[in-house]
Amino acid sequence: MLNGIVVVNKPRGVTSSDCVYKLRKILQIRKIGHAGTLDPEVNGVLPIAIGQATKLIELMHEKPKSYIGSGMFGKATDSYDLDGTTTAEEKIVTPFTSDEIISGMKKLTGKIDQVPPIYSAVRVNGKRLYEYARENIPVERPKRKVNIYSYELTQDPEYDPLEKTESFNFAIRCSKGTYVRSLVNDLGEELGVPAVMTSLTRTSSSGFDLSQAVDLETIEKEIDYPEKWLQPIDSFFVDLPQLQISPDQFKRVSNGASIKLNTTYAKVALVYNGHIKAIYQRQGKIYRPEMMLLKNE
């Protein structure tokens, strides 16, 4: 049985669930799930856990995500991207300088309260926001605390003198739960003009980046060579201290027993026969199991 993480390079025009469904059919595997939904028109890194790696999904969500994208000043939509209905338009007579845009981005960096787009999957009273939007039912969107580690302008903005709009490119590194569409909309609000996101690519997620991503067609062609497209479970724990355990210790670990270890780390990955078999956490003078990965081969 395969165990590991497939870093899929999701194309535009398909949902994250579509990718999971297609990969399930290709691999003929039932234990499978993705970590972090991408909107249909967003492409890039979509980590999909299979086999024992599905135990990691919650941990995978906790790691920062990175994006590159583009936006435009002069127009706003109800979805904060080009799929939505236009809600505001304003001719940009005097284009913003790079410094002005960077200043606005800095105000949106750090720990902030973010309001999600009305067209999003956030639940309010058991119902998703996009369902309220489609039914034209007013609803208060809850603010959510997110961490924007960096929000950067990646090149000088471009002004269109005919359309009187201004386009800009950005790079963002952020915590889970962040809506990049909202950050583009909020940047417009900081500068006092409508703004809309025009494209977005996720460049990293769950500790994996685009250089490790493969498309589903490649996986289908290379189905017999998983080493070409499957990231081992151990690769997810590269930042965690690892400790080799003896056969006797492994017997105890296999039974979920607490053990004493010659280390003081708060959390440690236990390795046996070259693979991580469990994650143990220190409690007082002993270590107790936090996650069992006994089938990780």
Curated annotation (Swiss-Prot):
It comes from the Bacteria. Its EC number is 5.4.99.25. GO terms for biological process: mRNA pseudouridine synthesis; tRNA pseudouridine synthesis. It is an enzyme of class 5 (isomerase). The keyword Isomerase applies. The active site is at D39. GO terms for molecular function: RNA binding; tRNA pseudouridine(55) synthase activity. It catalyses: uridine(55) in tRNA = pseudouridine(55) in tRNA. Keywords: Isomerase, tRNA processing. Belongs to the pseudouridine synthase TruB family. Type 1 subfamily. Responsible for synthesis of pseudouridine from uracil-55 in the psi GC loop of transfer RNAs. This is tRNA pseudouridine synthase B. It comes from Lactobacillus johnsonii (strain CNCM I-12250 / La1 / NCC 533). The gene is truB.
